[in-house]
Design a protein with these regions (language model features):
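Glycine-centered tight turns that cap/initiate beta-strands
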Residues: 71, 143, 308-311, 396
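Glycine-rich beta-alpha junction loops
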Residues: 11-12, 26-32, 221-222, 282-284, ...
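PLP-dependent enzyme catalytic core of the Aspartate aminotransferase-like
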Residues: 114-115, 123-125, 138, 142-145, ...
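Conserved small-domain helix->loop->beta segment predominantly found in fold-type I
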Residues: 266-269, 273-275, 280, 284, ...
């Protein structure tokens, strides 16, 4: 099936007399005819549902759809994008481990890596993703267990050289985990370029309507967990009577462990209602992303010529330093998110934001309505001046998420805000 068809049909195939649309299974638990059947479920000897924290039919439909769209082997949905990043990393990291991350990451991800993981005894090295591969390799240590980056960085809008980072991960004998939230699988499928795990904040473009909080982790099924560095997957798990994930579940070992161990113990499971809304949102993903891209490209070109704008970050512009990477990894389009530096810094940025009329001021991003934000005083507020600089966030940087409204209405609102900010 082609991508657009998968958006509609993957994950749920109703049989004779069943609902045409995946129903909401609003139940915490499930009944069985015998105690033996339940016992097999708990020992992972049989597939099925026994508690919604671990699995739910509505959520499973969303997971299977995401797996099909990303080209992986299995997916686990979570209650939020932040919990997806946390679980994806914690599934293979423990006290004493080290990992490498691009410095161009979302503020919440930066805080998780730099501060929360530090309290857990896990150390990160942030690297400049523009450095040559041989320079990046200098960050590798014997205990390096993962490499992390974002396909399109939030909010710097830098495009990742996925193949270069895949080579870095291979040199470290570690998996490459990529947050594909901004690109979506419609424009880029990182697994095809060497990524091993793909993460989403499904609250963004996959849902598309800012109505359902959620996250997802997709296992590419293409990493060798038996290389001696990941005993969590390749040696017996005593909580399941000595089960070895790599032996029992093969290519899906990573995601099964995340579900039956991390979700079991930490419990950031999505609500069935949110999974239903995510399923509905993904049905129109291809149509929405095309409109987001068209609007953002037009807005970026408008901003690039505007006298009150110092700089525009959008890889779709031929003047962008990442234009060649965009052509390689995202040849058919980009997200609807732009960031730009307004002349006058923080004070002028506030005036511009306050003057917006149709465009809303909000923390969210990547949904059907146009919205704007000042990262330095919101999503990245906890970062120091040095950390902000490392992440590419200046005092005058504004993040603009272009919705699917008529482009003339978007441009008119932006222009009147510029006039008010003079």
């Amino acid at each position: 099936m082609k991508f657009e068809t998968k958006c509609l049909h993957a994950g749920y195939n109703p049989k004779n007399g069943e609902p045409r649309v995946q129903p909401i299974v609003q139940s915490t638990t499930y009944t069985y005819d015998s105690a033996e059947e339940i016992g097999k479920l708990f020992d992972l000897q049989a597939a099925g549902y026994f508690y919604t924290r671990l699995a739910n039919p509505t959520t499973n439909a969303a997971e299977e759809k995401i797996t099909a769209l990303e080209g992986g082997v299995a997916t686990m949905c979570t209650a939020s994008g932040q919990s997806a990043v946390f679980y994806a990393m914690l599934n293979i990291l423990e006290a004493g481990d080290h990992f490498i991350s691009s410095s161009y990451v979302y503020g919440g991800t930066y805080n998780l890596f730099a501060h929360t993981f530090k309290k857990m005894g896990i150390e990160v090295t942030f690297v400049d993703q523009d450095l040559p591969l041989e320079e990046l390799k200098k960050a590798i240590r014997p205990n390096t267990k993962a490499v992390f980056a974002e396909t399109i960085a939030n909010p710097a809008l830098r495009v990742l050289d996925i193949e270069k980072f895949a080579a870095l991960a291979k040199a470290a004998e570690a998996p490459l985990l990529v947050d594909n939230t901004f690109a979506t699988p419609y424009f880029c499928r990182p697994i095809e370029f060497g990524a091993n795990v793909v993460i989403h904040s499904t609250s963004k473009y996959l849902d598309g309507h800012a109505i359902a909080l959620g996250g997802s982790i997709t296992d590419g099924g293409n990493f060798n967990w038996n290389n001696g560095k990941y005993p969590q997957l390749s040696t017996p798990d005593q909580t399941y009577h000595g089960l070895v994930y790599t032996e029992t579940f093969g290519p899906a070992a990573y995601i099964v462990k995340a579900r039956v161990q991390l979700m079991r113990d930490l419990g950031a499971a999505p609500a069935p209602q949110n999974s239903f809304l995510l399923n509905v949102g993904m049905e129109t993903l291809a149509l929405r992303m095309q409109r987001h891209y068209e609007n953002a490209q037009a807005v970026a070109e408008f901003l690039e010529k505007h006298p009150q704008v110092a700089k525009v970050n959008y890889p779709g512009l031929s003047s962008s330093p990442d234009y060649a990477l965009k052509q390689k990894y995202l040849p058919n389009g980009l997200c609807g998110v732009i960031s730009f530096e307004i002349k006058g810094g923080k004070e002028t940025a506030a005036k511009w934001l306050n003057a917006l009329q149709m465009t809303s001021r909000e923390v969210h991003v990547a949904d059907i309505r146009t919205c704007a934000l000042h990262p330095a005083t919101s999503t990245h507020r906890q970062l120091s001046e040095a950390e902000l600089e490392q992440a590419g966030i200046s005092a005058g940087l504004i993040r603009l998420s272009c919705g699917i409204e008529n482009i003339q209405d978007i441009l008119a609102d932006l222009e009147q805000a510029f006039a008010a900010a003079k």
